[in-house]
């Protein structure tokens, strides 16, 4: 069994290499014809004229990534500080649940909200009567990455050793001074990691931005300019592209992979540093060294100390304001979608026959269920077995284990649209499966596998070694110990990874359009094309005639996410074991 576990553990390495190799090979025709530098720095994208320059798309991607990270990162950081350091316990639980809920909302829902509410609002204040563009996309992306940044930052703040805080308070700091002067500084590596992860999601987002960007392949001139990102370029044109045009789109994905690689390298460098920076608490008072040593000079009558107190209080109130704005805005999105969508959920929409005259959700229900079953039945054993090898058979400081973990993290950072391209090239075309539910399911396996591995690995690592040693001392084999002691103890963590995977599958759209398909008809089997819930919602909104159905589908997606989060809360509260 050890070798089975090992093969499963290196699967992520094989997949990452395969994605890079296939994307590069299919990109070679455009690189040979135009040259890599001309392709990257070319200013004109006009497939009909055989001009393929993606620099405007690169600028657009970087532009909104920076803006959304500044906006979402700032609000996310201060929200995390308030929740972890200032909020009362009951409010902390509520806010944490709200943030976790909103982190699971599909991107297509955010995009539709932006198209329905944000774009009309910005159009009224725009100097050129345009609502779509850089500002709308940046706001939507900021809202999308805010829950991720908040959750990770909150975790890192709460992980700081308590004696750092106690030492700061003992030196005369207020609570606010201790938080912003000590705790935040000690956790800054983890905070930067959260922001970098947010950047990775922002630069790889497709569907939400496509609905509010305007999608013109030009360098944006101002906040209300139409623009196009690399991911949007792929999603818009891959459906009809052939020949060198198709190679140019795949080349765009290759350049996008290079950006993701750079972000992952930065993230790895941050993770190599110790989360907690060693520093002297007395450094907080280095400006006071010039003061007299008399104890009275450290009182709050001293002007400089008063300013430090005011600064700490100001940052505290900024945290309260950021939390209120973030939470209210995110809750408003959910309430708005539910209020507009729930009245339009009918039996005919759910279970009516979908044909040329009407579109219903029945094909999406069947297709999504089929993809859920197939992808989970493949990904769960792969992920759990990989985690078993990483925790039960790995050696301390093993370079191979470190390499596997790096590639697993890299796999989790690859944008959905790139997974979709890989699935189309390999599963649909190379293996001859075609656009089908099976091709979509296999693509989803690659998407959800990293989260299953890491969640299960973290759970298994938290199980005390004494339980394993006791089983082995009683004569049980290592494999029997794993299956009868370790895995049952880690059941809650495995269930958590499964629930999170279900949420990811239900909300996925970009990776499925060119693998599973985008059709309105009932699938006849796994080799038939089928549309997931999110893809069907995208089809509803694209038609322009099914606005009520789009709101209804968005409401159903939100209800699913709420139910999944409730299950997640139950699993963590009732099934998780404390050792």
Task: Please report, for each region that a protein language model flagged, where it lies by residue.
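C-terminal transmembrane helix and the adjacent membrane-cytosol boundary/short C-terminal tail
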Residues: 154-162, 169, 196, 236-296, ...
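Generic hydrophobic transmembrane alpha-helix motif, especially the helices
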Residues: 100-141, 409-444
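Hydrophobic alpha-helical transmembrane segments of multipass integral membrane proteins
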Residues: 59, 63-71, 75, 79, ...
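Transmembrane alpha-helices
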Residues: 152-153, 175-211, 455-456, 464, ...
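Glycine/proline-centered hinge or cleavage motifs at structural transition points of membrane proteins
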Residues: 106, 171-172, 415, 474-475, ...
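Periplasmic/extracellular loop-to-transmembrane helix junction in inner-membrane transport proteins
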Residues: 3, 25-68, 88, 236-246, ...
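Interhelical loop and adjacent transmembrane-helix boundary motif
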Residues: 124, 209-257, 357, 512-558
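Transmembrane-helix boundary motif in ABC transporter permease subunits
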Residues: 67-99, 263, 267-276, 375-408, ...
